[in-house]
Amino acid sequence: MSPVEISGADAVVSPPMRGRVPLPPPPPPPPPPMRRRAPLPPPPPPPMRRRAPLPPPPPPAMRRRVLPRPPPPPPPLPMFDAEVLCCCYPPTRVRREAPLPPPPLIFVGAPPPTCALKGIVCCFPCPSKKKSSLKRFNWVKITRALPGSLWDELQIQQVCHGDIEDEQILCAIELDVSEIETFFSLGAAKPEKDPLIDLRRATDTELTLMLLNIRLPADMMAAIMAMDESVLDDDEIRGLINLFPTKENMELLMSYTGGKWTLEKWEQYFQELRKVLRVESKLRVFYFKIQFSTKITQFKKRLNVVNSACEEVCSSQKLKEIMKKITCLGNTSNQGTGRGVTVGFNLDSLCVKSMHNFCKVLASEASDLLDVHKDLQSLESASKKQLKSLAEEMQDIIRDLEKLNQELTAAETDGPDSQVFRNVCWFCSYGYFDQPWI
């Protein structure tokens, strides 16, 4: 095998190989082992800053439109020395085929036109802010006159100028201004009232006086002194007593030095009534006089029922015999005990079962005693009366009679004005203080 010839600078002359096959070059060393690592996660996206949404842009500024100033109002009408004024009907529409042109301005720098009649002025509606000094005329306004009606006919007859609009058509009539002001003037302002007590009590008192239909103070004073039941009844007197002012309010009324008409209505009533000496005491005596006969009659009726029942119980021989037998039966049953040998017993302590057994014994031995209820006719009605209420009612009557006696004693020094009051208290001379039931 001949050597390979390579020409050039890179030619290498290899020695001739002697009968051996040349070995291949050694393989390159393996690369160093690489450590297996988990792939890194992708980096997170950068945080986004939260920003508040921007407000919407403001609308483009609109040019402010300057409105023209309204024209000044026309000057007020001059005052004329006329005894008769032209009053006009409210503006109404009159049917026309074609609208009229707008009227020219009237009464600006020129006096108003006058009618042919002396003292009559034709005026047209113009805006006026002056408040009328007359009372308001209450009516239902008609804004449109129906064709063929009375108002339509009057509007057509009273047209003063043909070039005036329908809304300005006015009519002229003769009116006396001084007479109108006399009848329809507002009058002087009422004086302010000066209440002496709280408004709530004053309102309640005034409403009660209206419901009771209280008369004039002069009539009331005369009726109280004479105790005339035809003028004031018991309901009205009781209402006056309940509404009577307290001691503090009465002192305020007595010390009041202002005008009479500046007080409330009920304060005026009681200010007139305070002229009567001890008016509240006299009102109570008057009320007691009206109620006296009825109260005494009803009290005597209830008291007589109780007295009759007591008399029947004390006089019934059958009831006494029954009580005697019950006592003997009880002593026999309770012999040898602490409850035996008794002289009497309480009816409430008896047992109902024992009474049933006693009635069986009584029916077999003394049947004539079973009709004892015939001797006690008033006992059932008397059992419904309460002795405590009767005693309280009797004490009330005695207390009222004592107050009456005190008022009569005090009225002796009041002079001739209280003479009628002393004479009408006749029921005190009957001597109820000496009655045995009192």
Swiss-Prot record:
Residues 124-438 form the FH2 domain. Coiled coil: none annotated. This is Putative formin-like protein 21a. Residues 22-61 have a biased composition (Pro residues). Residues 1-74 are annotated as: Disordered. SMART domains: FH2 (SM00498). Signal peptide: none annotated.
